[in-house]
């Protein structure tokens, strides 16, 4: 039964919701406010997506599940550090570099987590129910983040929340 999923799993899925909205909405808006040029902004995200693609290809070749778990934990720490650094960095060039590195590192969390969890879910034969449950949990994570931002009203609150959420992948 899907209701019997471990609590740490549900928290990790909510963390994905938080991290996705920060990465796909708040970070680009913040970065554009610093870079302030469409071509530079587009180039940064083009290079970031290429870095993410390289990471995805590399991670896709790993079949050892124990190795994936180790990569997941390392990725959680590194992504957390990247998001913490975004609070303190101000220069456009360094922000661009952090964006590119962050895109690669995000795959160190997302691909191993999805691989390990889908393996487990498929074995228990409730994939359709899981997909719906995952969507609900990601939405709850997004609502939590928006609540935090409603209180603190600053980009740094989103970046700090994302840093903390990446640490949930250590356990």
Segments the model singles out, each with a brief description of its role:
Residues 70-85:
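Structural signature of the two symmetry-related core transmembrane helices
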Residues 5-24, 48-61, 98-148:
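Substrate-agnostic recognition of the 12-TM MFS/MFS-like secondary transporter fold
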Residues 31, 62-64, 148-153:
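Interfacial helix-cap and linker-helix signal at transmembrane-aqueous boundaries
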Residues 147-170:
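A membrane-interface helix-boundary motif in multi-pass transporters
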Residues 2-10, 38, 92-96:
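Primarily residues marking transmembrane-helix entry/exit sites
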Residues 25-42:
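Short amphipathic helix-loop junctions that connect adjacent transmembrane helices
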Residues 85-102:
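Helix-loop junctions at membrane interfaces in 12-TM secondary transporters
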Residues 1-13, 164-171:
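Intracellular loop-helix junctions on the cytosolic face of multi-pass helical membrane proteins
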């Amino acid at each position: 039964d899907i209701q019997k999923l471990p609590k740490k799993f549900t928290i990790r899925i909510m963390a994905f919701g938080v991290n996705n909205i920060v990465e796909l909405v708040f970070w680009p808006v913040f970065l554009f406010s610093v870079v302030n040029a469409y071509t530079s902004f587009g180039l940064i995200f083009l290079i970031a997506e290429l870095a993410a693609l390289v990471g995805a290809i590399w991670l896709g070749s790993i079949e050892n599940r124990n190795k994936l778990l180790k990569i997941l934990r390392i990725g959680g720490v590194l992504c957390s550090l990247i998001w913490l650094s975004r609070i303190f960095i101000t220069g456009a060039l360094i922000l661009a570099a952090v964006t590119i590195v962050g895109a690669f590192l995000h795959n160190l969390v997302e691909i191993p987590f999805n691989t390990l969890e889908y393996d487990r879910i498929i074995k228990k034969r409730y994939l359709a129910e899981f997909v719906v449950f995952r969507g609900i949990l990601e939405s709850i994570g997004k609502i939590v983040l928006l609540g935090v931002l409603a209180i603190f009203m600053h980009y740094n609150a989103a970046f700090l929340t994302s840093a903390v959420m990446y640490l949930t992948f250590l356990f």
